[in-house]
């Protein structure tokens, strides 16, 4: 059976931060930070699939911002399912006001899963 893994990406011009999430888990996993290059996204997904040891379908997403559609187009040309989320859809939990790239990536992955 193929697992669906949601990859939240907090993207900036200086770096990308990734976090994976599955619909049956309550916590993100495989957090990583890389240089800002779409090939790093593909490499990251290959590493996650290898670690899991099973066939995986990935759905990636990032919040609309400075990169616009460029990352989206690069990933979809490579066959990667990618979604751009509007900032207004990003729910902030009360009490978690400290923003970090890791938290943002996990939040994006969670939004993709649900």
Predicted region positions:
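Phosphate- and other anionic-substrate recognition elements at nucleic-acid/protein interfaces
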Residues: 1-114
């Amino acid at each position: 059976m193929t697992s669906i893994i949601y990859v939240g990406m907090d993207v900036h011009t200086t770096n990308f931060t990734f976090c994976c999430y599955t619909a049956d888990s309550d916590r993100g996993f495989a957090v990583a930070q890389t240089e800002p290059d779409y090939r790093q996204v593909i490499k990251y997904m290959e590493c996650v699939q290898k670690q899991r040891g099973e066939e995986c379908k990935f759905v990636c997403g990032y919040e609309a911002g400075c990169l616009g559609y460029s990352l989206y187009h690069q990933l979809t040309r490579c066959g990667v399912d990618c979604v751009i989320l509007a900032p207004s859809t990003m729910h902030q939990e009360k009490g978690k006001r400290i923003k970090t790239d890791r938290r943002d990536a996990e939040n994006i992955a969670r939004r993709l899963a649900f």
